[in-house]
Amino acid sequence: MNYVPELKKYYKDSVIKELVKEFEYKSIMQVPKLEKIVISVGVGEAVRNKKLLDSAVLELAQITGQKAVKTKAKKAIAGFKIRQGQEIGAKVTLRGNAMYEFLYKLIHLALPRVKDFRGINGDAFDGNGNYSFGITEQIIFSEIDYDKIERISGLNITIVTTASNDKESKALLLKFGMPFSN
């Protein structure tokens, strides 16, 4: 039998039924679900130090279990000494089982390790049911060895759902156990 992540099982067994009751959907196909999770890191100093970008790519791969892709500058910014097409960051897009595994790890293992953690901002939805937030230190993930990192950097995490509005999306993430502060 194929492996199914715990969070995916929980979604199919409990969350769908609860959301159908709460929002009175006529079909379970209307119930919002996770589409993908995008984890990105911007390395502005990569302009001067290429080692930092390689380090960020490696750390993203360790955190997610999937190879990271380097991202390039869309346009030149003279103030930051960035040219168009220059590699300045990295990202990973998770789908399927890897997405559910990462979300479980984020909610239950990584976020509780943040100092003075009181929940994440519950207002950072984009109006289309997607949620984005930042983490200031990558060392909250247990896969990162504190002694081997080049420098402490932050991560941007975007959770893309099929929800049509923010209310449905927030309800979905709350059912998964996302620790919102408001």
From Swiss-Prot:
Disulfide bond positions: none
Keywords recorded for this protein, A-Z: Ribonucleoprotein, Ribosomal protein, RNA-binding, rRNA-binding, tRNA-binding
A single GO molecular function term of this UniProt record: tRNA binding
CC terms in the record's Gene Ontology section: ribonucleoprotein complex; ribosome
UniProt keyword Ribosomal protein, yes or no: yes
Domain of life: Bacteria
GO BP terms in the entry: translation
Gene3D superfamilies: 3.30.1440.10
InterPro entries, per database record: Ribosomal_uL5, Ribosomal_uL5_bac-type, Ribosomal_uL5_C, Ribosomal_uL5_CS, Ribosomal_uL5_dom_sf, Ribosomal_uL5_N
Function description: This is one of the proteins that bind and probably mediate the attachment of the 5S RNA into the large ribosomal subunit, where it forms part of the central protuberance. In the 70S ribosome it contacts protein S13 of the 30S subunit (bridge B1b), connecting the 2 subunits; this bridge is implicated in subunit movement. Contacts the P site tRNA; the 5S rRNA and some of its associated proteins might help stabilize positioning of ribosome-bound tRNAs.
Family, similarity comment: Belongs to the universal ribosomal protein uL5 family.
Subunit structure comment from the entry: Part of the 50S ribosomal subunit; part of the 5S rRNA/L5/L18/L25 subcomplex. Contacts the 5S rRNA and the P site tRNA. Forms a bridge to the 30S subunit in the 70S ribosome.
Protein name: Large ribosomal subunit protein uL5
Name of the gene this protein is made from: rplE
